[in-house]
């Protein structure tokens, strides 16, 4: 008998997602244990299986938290592999412009879009960014996210990018969610460099990336927005090759607005993920599959932009890609952070069934940030990151449009969300 400090019993279904990241037909296999149970000690899972088997192998004590799921579904905590949640200000006016027919590109050409958030974020202090970020992490937790990637990219100067990354690091230290930081100084060309783009690329390669690499814990990945009018394929290659040389994993915002070649570049460089992919060709998607680069679909962005297509997730699966889902939470093109809602959009607009969408939002999303050995599934040895739904099965997530489906959230074996309240400590 093994002593445990967490025991979850009474699951209507225990959705384990065991067996690693999924491709093809395996995405439909959620590895469900009817009437399953889970036990953990010191933040890690020590037993998972049918309830009677688990109860025979573990020992509870006076300090053991026993949670009765009462016939509801128990699933892995959601992993959001793509957010921009460290920012100041908002872009509600931009939303109104889109309702009036303005496109993302038209708003950006007027000096809005990303640059609007850059101005607000530059004006904010690091402490202000931390407090804003902590409040947003609370909202993610309330909606079942237990691991989240957070990008910089609203500073676009050495000092402001470092400020953003330090704010991300500080909020990670003060919040129970696992936060994976990504440097994205190549999110846009700042106004002061518009007439000398090459000088900004030089700054990224020669100063920003080395400075970020020199400070422990600031970033695990580097990302580039490879798009017409932002960074060309050649510029992106130069930035990402330098990032790789400095030890960063690399990611690419690829083929969101046009088929520029970002997805093919991601495959060429062995990027851990390529993201957006609305206009990626079959040839490029096949290259992603061959390279093992995770294809991260962000249906919330297409939904919020209204006039954008959706990524061809069904085709990605047919071509052998590892398909993941993320929120792309940001103040402009997707002010939505709830992964249950993203799962709903994936089922309605990307052609995924609920099991495929849940795999894409858990174990495959974990692979998109190099965390699949730690999170994304309920298996012995992994972090005890668990969501207890308010519904009897995971298929009810999109059925309820992602609303009100999260009852409790456990992070590293500790109950952090209960009855609509977040417990940071």
From Swiss-Prot:
Which EC numbers characterise this protein's activity in its record? 3.5.2.7
Cellular location of this protein? Cytoplasm
Under which pathway is this protein filed?
Answer: Amino-acid degradation; L-histidine degradation into L-glutamate; N-formimidoyl-L-glutamate from L-histidine: step 3/3
Q: Could you say which residues bind N-formimidoyl-L-glutamate here?
A: 154, 330, 332
> Matching InterPro entries, A to Z?
Amidohydro-rel, HutI, Metal-dep_hydrolase_composite, Metal_Hydrolase
What cellular-component terms does GO give this entry?
A: cytoplasm
State where it is primarily located.
cytoplasm
A Pfam family matched by this chain, by name?
Amidohydro_1
GO biological process, alphabetically ordered: L-histidine catabolic process to glutamate and formamide; L-histidine catabolic process to glutamate and formate
Give the reactions, separated by semicolons, that this protein catalyses: 4-imidazolone-5-propanoate + H2O = N-formimidoyl-L-glutamate
Q: What PANTHER family does this protein's entry cite?
A: IMIDAZOLONEPROPIONASE, IMIDAZOLONEPROPIONASE-RELATED
Q: Which family does it belong to?
A: Belongs to the metallo-dependent hydrolases superfamily. HutI family.
**Which protein are we looking at?**
Imidazolonepropionase
Q: Which organism is it from?
A: Symbiobacterium thermophilum (strain DSM 24528 / JCM 14929 / IAM 14863 / T)
Q: Which gene encodes it?
A: hutI
